[in-house]
């Protein structure tokens, strides 16, 4: 009976990858114009062994003045999660919503800290509704499957 008890535990949260580029420094630092900011987020999950998953949230933050990059930060925050005895129809939501919600605050802090340490005002990543993001991805996948089947 104990084997059937659902298990959801965080084993570890860690910074998997981080890069910062300032390709146009120092000249770009003399510009007075406000840069544009583009932020891209992604979530990926990989099974490690039976019942253990790595879930990673990736952020790419690029700031530009005109067509020149001020800085580019790419960060991947990951977590190892033990997920066992959970119904198959709930696994997607746990991996696509619950796990990223746990990891994301660490990613936000690492991005803000990296940008600040590089000498720029911090970039604060907004709160993310991972449930809405997951539902959009599921709807897009269902739509793609429907259009492929026709």
Swiss-Prot record:
Where found in the cell? Cytoplasm
Gene Ontology biological process terms in this record: protein folding; protein tetramerization; protein transport
Q: Name one GO molecular function term.
A: unfolded protein binding
The UniProt entry lists the main location of this chain as cytoplasm
Q: Which Gene3D superfamilies match?
A: SecB-like
Matching entries from SUPFAM superfamilies are given as:
SecB-like
Lineage top rank: taxon: Bacteria
Task: Could you list this entry's UniProt keywords, alphabetically sorted.
Answer: Chaperone, Cytoplasm, Protein transport, Translocation, Transport
| One of the record's GO cellular component terms | cytoplasm
| Pfam families attached to this UniProt entry | SecB
Subunit-structure text: Homotetramer, a dimer of dimers. One homotetramer interacts with 1 SecA dimer.
Which family, according to UniProt?
Belongs to the SecB family.
Q: What does this protein do?
A: One of the proteins required for the normal export of preproteins out of the cell cytoplasm. It is a molecular chaperone that binds to a subset of precursor proteins, maintaining them in a translocation-competent state. It also specifically binds to its receptor SecA.
Q: What is this protein called?
A: Protein-export protein SecB
Q: Which organism is it from?
A: Acidovorax ebreus (strain TPSY)
Q: Which gene encodes it?
A: secB
């Amino acid at each position: 009976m104990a084997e059937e008890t659902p298990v959801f535990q965080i084993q570890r949260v860690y910074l998997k990858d981080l890069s910062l580029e300032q390709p146009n420094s120092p000249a770009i630092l003399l510009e007075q114009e406000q840069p544009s900011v583009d932020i891209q987020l992604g979530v990926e999950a990989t099974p490690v062994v039976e019942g253990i998953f790595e879930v990673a949230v990736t952020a790419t933050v690029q700031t530009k003045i005109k067509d020149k990059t001020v800085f580019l930060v790419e960060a991947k925050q990951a977590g190892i999660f033990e997920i066992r005895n959970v119904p198959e129809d709930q696994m997607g939501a746990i991996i696509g919503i619950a796990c990223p919600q746990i990891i994301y605050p660490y990613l936000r802090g690492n991005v803000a800290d990296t940008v600040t340490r590089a000498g720029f005002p911090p970039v604060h990543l907004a709160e993310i509704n991972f449930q809405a993001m997951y539902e959009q991805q599921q709807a897009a996948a269902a739509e793609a499957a429907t259009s492929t089947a026709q």
